[in-house]
Amino acid sequence: MQTVLRRYSGKGAKELFDLLEEHKVDVEETMGGVKGLVTYTLVRSGDGGFSVTVCQDRTGIDEGVQRAKEWIAKNAGSIGAAAPEVTEGTVIAHLNKS
């Protein structure tokens, strides 16, 4: 499995996460269609927030990153949020507990 973490902070980040929260159903529908998606999580932090996307393979990660970029460009382009800090890697342990 592969993971990408996209961290938004600085200019426009708080406003971006306000908008993401307001449109979370649309965001979930957009990201839910990613092929091979294992999990997608949006987290608000003090200065903005971050997303964590876990997919079965690199293809899913690439699709998820592209969908996120397109959603932000279409729905939040006027906010002027800085580009996210992106960290990617291979999952070494994964646990789901309900």
Functional labels for PLM-detected ranges:
Residues M1-F50, Q56-E70, G77-S98:
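Short S/T/G/P-rich N-terminal loop/turn motif that feeds into the first structured element of a domain
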